[in-house]
Amino acid sequence: MVREEVAVSTRTLQWKCVESRTDSNRLYYGRFVLSPLMKGQADTIGIAMRKALLGEIEGTCITRAKSEKVPHEYSTIVGIEESVHEILMNLKEIVLKSNLYGTRDASICVRGPKYVTAQDIISPPSVEIVDTTQHIASLTEPINLCIELQIERDRGYRMKAPNNYQDGSYPIDAVSMPVRNANHSIHSYGSGNEKQEILFLEIWTNGSLTPKEALHEASRNLIDLFIPFLHAEEQDIHLNLEDNQNRFTVSPFTLHDRLGNIRKNKKEIALKCIFIDQSELPTRTYNCLKRSNIHTLLDLLNNSQEDLMRIEHFRIEDIKQILDILQKHFGIDLPKNKRF
């Protein structure tokens, strides 16, 4: 029998941004390419990435509003052009940016006549308003308007519960989706066994993060989903045949469990899979690193202590915390100076 030789590409898989633009404060666009891929791989990656972009990325939004002396959602207030329902819909559209966890309170307290915009929202320091010009209400008379707001960080779309509140508190449909849309297309080239594909990925965001940031976060979320399948040992899988023959649970895969992978082959790949937000770093330190495009442990180890001290707002205490974590969990030291 004659064995047919199969040609396999030895080129490194690469991606790059081929187009990036800001259409408005609340509409960013980015176009990316990934190549070379084997036949069928582009569709596999494109479908998974689109789902992750639209459903796995967290966003921040207003989820509840409260104002006294409002009988019901569809009532009107003398001196305000919009109905209560219209004001709630305007609040729903406000684009926020934050790294908060849990619930935060905000408020609006103004006096008319006034054109009320997102700029009038008094929010916590951890919450940033992306477009301060977004319209909320128009006060046509000298009246006071005070609204208490609840802000949450979540993912996807959450329908508000039926409103049975009598205290002027109204839930708002939570749309925690920073990515407005995502499309992928495929270009094939070559022939026979050498046929390859290029994946084109288009991303539109609401301005709370860039398309590149969205692509990075979606990729990270996909990696986190698949890591348990890569590393879970047979003894870590607990079958519960008594309750349900088709159900099994996998032990949580913690940061500590990944340490063995670093000392194995493919060390660089393992380092790429460990993101700095999975460590014990304080929020301020994490945000400083993220702003400097340091997202993974590999990114961090490509810098020296001297490099980190050049980061804006970085302190010597932050360096010590990073060194302690690297030594404690990984047995790795960060050089003081860049080695050439």
UniProtKB/Swiss-Prot annotation:
Main location: plastid
Reaction(s) this enzyme catalyzes, per UniProt: RNA(n) + a ribonucleoside 5'-triphosphate = RNA(n+1) + diphosphate
Organism from which the protein derives: Calycanthus floridus var. glaucus (Eastern sweetshrub)
Gene name in the database record: rpoA
Family, as annotated: Belongs to the RNA polymerase alpha chain family.
Keywords noted in UniProt: Chloroplast, DNA-directed RNA polymerase, Nucleotidyltransferase, Plastid, Transcription, Transferase
Listed name of the protein: DNA-directed RNA polymerase subunit alpha
Pfam families recorded: RNA_pol_A_bac (PF01000), RNA_pol_A_CTD (PF03118), RNA_pol_L (PF01193)
Any one annotated GO CC term: mitochondrion
EC number: 2.7.7.6
